[in-house]
Every structure is written in structure tokens, then in C-alpha cells.
Amino acid sequence: MMGAMQVVLEALHQGDYDTAFETLVRTLALAQGQDAAEAALLLAEAYSLYGEGGIEGANRALEEGLVSVPTLESHPRYRSILGEMRALEGAPEEDVRQILTKTSDPHALYHQAQALMYLGLPEEALEVLNQPLELPAFLAWRAHTLQGKAYERMGQAAEAAAAYKEASRLAVGLEHYWNLIDASAMFVEAGLGHEALQALREAQPDIPELEDPEDAATRYYLEARSQLLLGNPGLALDAIQRALEKEREGAEPAHGTPLVHGQALMQLGHPREAIEAFREAVGRAEDSDKSYALHELAVAYLESGELAEAESTLREVMRDPEYGYQGEAYGDLAEILYRLGRYEEASQAAHEAIRLGSLSAGHLILGNLACDLLHLEEALEHYALASEEAPEGSRDWVTAQQMAVDTLAQLGFRRPDEIISRSEAVLPYLHPADEWHQTLNNYAERARNMIGGNRTLN
């Protein structure tokens, strides 16, 4: 019996399910008493790996175990697998909790965590999974994968990525590969481009010789998003074009592919080309994804100088009450209205952006409005706030730094040290051919002369 069970455990770990099921069915037919009960429990566990597709088989195995050992009904693993199956069938939470029992059995705890996940209780599942569980190899990696799913459902992308990465370390073959792909996806969501690319590189040796176009498209999509995070739009464009090619070869068209295509083109400074990509993304997307794609399209119109189209597209976004970036949308609308010369509306939109948390965009427009009225003190205050709130290197941050220096210069080169420090901070983000590059250099040089120093720019 022990030899047969070892064969089953190894087969399950290696993904050789035919051998595992054949051995279990044969063992269950020949065994009696506790041996039959143990075989039935392991058979039920094996069926449980198939999710909904394994419900009937798992229930049948549990029933066969009861025939051999009627007292099996009180066994923690029996009750945990039964609870998992009931949760998977959609039973009420209260009914499932009555089945589950307090236990320290690692197998039982794993299946309880699965049941809790099926009930939509990832926090409770994590309380179970974060305990040290000594599980056989075929369940050990799955416990970490389940941990990753729980963190993912809770919106904790970095923690999910770490769990999937650990699962990949313990898994073999395609399961090793898929956990690395999941880890890469979560690293991307966490904004960790380097770690995402590293996970993709680790998955490379496990890519099937005849890779499904769908899987290849996913891989190239993640590579493109990783490169965008790392500020490599050219490499991102290469990768996303490969993903689009895989869609033409049969992969399911996803809204994210043209969306990332457009984002790469935007970073490369080609907003007009990006418009077509974002239009395609809008056509493919639904619900909040569609609103996000519309927002990207509006920004592309804005950058292309097509202000009327930008405004109408953005107002469509703002009609979605569930959209999670309303503050940013109001900030972009404020810029559009400012550039259209509708200053009162621009001011209202900017204040609404600030109220909704998009501080840098709102203060930037309010600074521009104050500057136009020659209210330079007020303008400087807004630009300073915008530069503090915007992420360093972002479009808003660069613009706020430029305008703060320019305003200080208009105020008679007040605070020359600040002119120098702001100029030194922003110059690395500007192309030498950018007219602001020379302007800031000139301002900084004059400020240094005023304080009699010999500081040089980086």
C-alpha cells in the first residue's frame, strides 16, 4: 500500500495524472479498512485538483471511503474535502462552515483554504495558508499558488507575485512555467518591471516547442508592459507588436494589447499613431476597461492638439460613475479647457481635480491661470505644490519644475539657490534639443553669477 501511495504522490507532482488515477482506482478496489479509506481520500484530493470538473469524482471517492470505514466521516481531511466540494457547488457559507472542523492536519487545512477561497473569503484563506504547512509536493506548490490568488484578489500585487514565485520554485514542467507567468503579471501590477522581466526570463526554458498563440501573446504583452515600466518604449513596442502578431495567428484579441501598443507610441512621442491603437482598445474593451481606454484616447487627442475630440472623449469617460481615475480625468479636462481659452471652466475643473486627489494636475493649471493674470506669487505657490505632488520625472513634475523656475526668474531671480536646484533636478529629464533645456541652463547660470558661486550643472 505504501509503495502504491508513493507512486501516486510522485505522479501527481509530475503531472502524470493517468498513472495517479489508475494506481488509486486499482488500490481502492483491492484495499480494505484504513488502507481503502486512505486511498479514497487521496483519490478525492486528486479529483479536487480539477475544480468544478472534479466535483463528481471527489464526491464518489468520499462515498467509497465511507463504505470502507464509516467513521471516516469525522476525519478532518474528509470533512475539509467535502467542505471544499460544497463551497465549489455554491453552498451557503454557513453550511460549509458547519462541515469544516478545527484541525492541525496540513492536508485538511489546505482544503479548508480552498473552501474559503470558493466562498470569497481570501483574508481567512490567508490566515490558514500563512501557517507552516508540511504538504506533499503536489500540494505544496499549489498552496503557494492559492496564497498568490488570495493576495491577488485582495489587491496586494507584490505579495501575490512573491507567492507565485515561490510556487514556481516548487512546481515542475508547465506548472513551473505558469506560476512564473502569474508572478510576472503581478510584478507588472505592482510596478516592478525588472522583477517581471526576470520572471519571464526564468520561464523561457519551459516554453513549449509548439507554443499556443494565446500563451505567446500573453508573454509578449507582459514583456511590453515591463519594458514600459522601465522606460524602454522602443523595446515595449517590439514586444507588443509580437503580441499583436500572435492575435492575428489565432490568439483571442484582448483590449490590453492595442492599449499597450498605444502607450508605447505615446512614450515614443507619436500621439497621432497612438490614437488608432487606443481606438482599437476602446472597441475591444468593456465597462471600466473601456473607460480607461477612452481616457488614454483622450490624452492622445490632447497631445495631438485635437482638443475638441479630447474634450468629448473625456466627458464620455466622466459619465462612468465607477471609473477609478476621475481626479486624473478632471485634471486632463482642466488642461483641455485651459488650452481652449475657457478659463473659468478650466479653473472649476482644476479645483475638482484637486478635490478628487489629482493634486499635481489641478495645481499646474491653477498656476498657469494665475501666471496669465500676472499673479506670480500665487502661480509660484501652485507650481511648487504641483512639483511636490507629482512623481519625479512625470510630465506634470517636469512642467511644474520648469514653470516654477520661470516664475522665479520673472520675480527678479528671487531665491537663486532654488532656481539652481530646480534646474539641476529637471535638466536630466529634458532632451538637449528641447528649448527648455537651454532656457533652464541660462536661468541657472545667471542665478549662479548672482550668488557668486561656481556650481556646475550635472
Model feature map: region roles:
Residues 2, 38-40, 74-77, 107, ...:
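Start-of-helix register in tetratricopeptide repeats
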Residues 28-37, 67-77, 98-103, 133-138, ...:
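Flexible helix-coil transition and linker loops at the boundaries of alpha-helical arrays
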Residues 20, 58, 92-96, 125, ...:
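Single-residue signature of alpha-solenoid repeat helices
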Residues 15, 51-53, 90, 120, ...:
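Residue-level detector of the short coil/turn that links helix A to helix B
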Residues 9, 45-47, 84, 114, ...:
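Residue-level recognition of tetratricopeptide repeat
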Residues 6, 42-44, 77-81, 111, ...:
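"A position-specific structural signal for the A-helix of alpha-solenoid helical repeats
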